[in-house]
């Protein structure tokens, strides 16, 4: 397949692996304290496991997994608020499929649907808007979640709802922003992060220039990378070369998709509809300053929480689960005592096992047999 197969070419993959092996000797890092490269995107995590890229690295280079999966950081209380709204008479609650099985304290949206709530899977926010127009006697709620990748589509949908004066359409906001999260990670003492592989999809919207503070303020090299084996390995090579040269810069491996300035039209739509400020709670990580998203005054009439006023929910994570440590690269999924036994894809305890982009789900899918052996 054009534009895919050439980025999976085995000969070129092995050339990059050989180059990494050769250059790794020049790193100051050892097998006991390897160069720790955090891949922030769940898509990167799955590609790394699927193609076994982490097993090809020299012993003094390691991939660690970051909080780059928005479904994985959904707080239990937010799920419970969604269930409360979805269970009300006359409501059609629309969500992406990944969020259906995320557990809250009072179950999941899938369980709410089984109990009679009208919960529907949609593939875009425009699907939810069409449902609202087709069912004027019902109140239709779209559960908007995701990083900057999905925010432009939500913003454009809300613009359409305003222009068409759709009065029965509402938006439950769980959009969050990536950059404050990276700053929060680096502000933690002993974070152990030496370099970043930044997500291609988010960067397509915000550009590469937005990451400048990571290099200037925290002196960490960062490379925006694509999702195929050659992308990720080339990104690792670029980070290794920066580390050897004692440089901390933002580089763009994914130039075929990501412009340095990002997407100005998407950024303008987001700025029109959303206020990119405020605190937001992240599952396993707590409250992160300035990572929240709210509607601007012109769009506040679509705010589902203001309209339905669900009871405030704040649910503490089970202390047995190590979701927060996995999300910050402090432990591997299989090191959690609940992994594969209490928490597995059939009966997920944490969101990292539910989402198709979760590190625990990736480890279970590609490494569980090896781990059991």
Predicted regions and their residues:
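Metallocofactor- and cofactor-centric catalytic cores in central/energy metabolism, strongly enriched
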Residues: 1-137, 151, 155, 159-164, ...
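Hydrophobic alpha-helical scaffolding
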Residues: 6, 72, 143, 147, ...
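Structural motif
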Residues: 92, 139-141, 195
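Phosphate/pyrophosphate-binding betaalpha-module
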Residues: 143, 147-210
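A conserved active-site cap/scaffold subdomain adjacent to cofactor or substrate pockets
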Residues: 172, 190-259
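Internal helical hairpin/lid segments
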Residues: 234-325
């Amino acid at each position: 397949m054009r534009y895919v197969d050439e980025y999976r070419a085995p000969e070129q993959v092995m050339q990059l692996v050989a180059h990494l092996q050769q250059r790794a000797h020049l790193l100051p890092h050892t097998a006991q304290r390897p160069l720790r490269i955090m891949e922030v995107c769940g898509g990167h995590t799955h590609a790394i496991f699927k193609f076994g890229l982490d097993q090809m690295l020299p012993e003094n280079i390691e991939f660690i997994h970051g909080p780059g999966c928005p479904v994985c950081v959904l707080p239990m209380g937010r799920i419970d608020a969604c269930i409360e709204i979805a269970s009300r008479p006359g409501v059609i609650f629309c969500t992406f499929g990944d969020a259906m099985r995320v557990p809250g304290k009072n179950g999941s949206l899938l369980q709410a649907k089984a109990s009679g709530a009208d919960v529907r899977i949609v593939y875009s926010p425009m699907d939810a808007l069409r449902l609202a127009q087709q069912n004027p006697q019902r109140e239709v709620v779209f559960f908007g979640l995701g990083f900057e990748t999905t925010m432009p589509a939500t913003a454009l949908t809300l613009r359409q709802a305003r222009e068409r004066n759709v009065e029965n359409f509402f938006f439950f906001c769980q959009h969050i922003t990536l950059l404050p999260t990276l700053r929060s990670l680096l502000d933690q003492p002993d974070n152990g992060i030496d370099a970043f592989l930044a997500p291609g999809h988010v960067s397509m919207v915000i550009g590469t220039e937005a990451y400048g503070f990571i290099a200037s303020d925290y002196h960490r090299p960062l490379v925006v990378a694509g999702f195929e084996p050659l992308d990720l390995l080339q990104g690792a090579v670029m980070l290794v070369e920066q580390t050897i040269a004692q440089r901390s810069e933002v580089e763009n491996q994914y130039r075929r998709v990501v412009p340095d300035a990002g997407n100005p039209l998407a950024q303008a739509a987001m700025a029109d509809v959303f206020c990119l400020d405020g605190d937001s709670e992240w599952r396993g990580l707590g409250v992160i300053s300035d990572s929240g998203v709210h509607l601007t005054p012109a769009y506040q009439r679509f705010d589902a929480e203001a309209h339905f006023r669900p009871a405030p929910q704040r649910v503490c994570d089970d202390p047995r689960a190590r979701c927060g440590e996995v999300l910050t690269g402090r432990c591997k999924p299989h090191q959690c005592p609940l992994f594969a036994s209490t928490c597995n894809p059939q009966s997920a305890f944490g969101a990292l096992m539910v989402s198709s982009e979760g590190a625990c789900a990736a480890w279970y899918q590609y490494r569980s047999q090896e781990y059991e052996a």
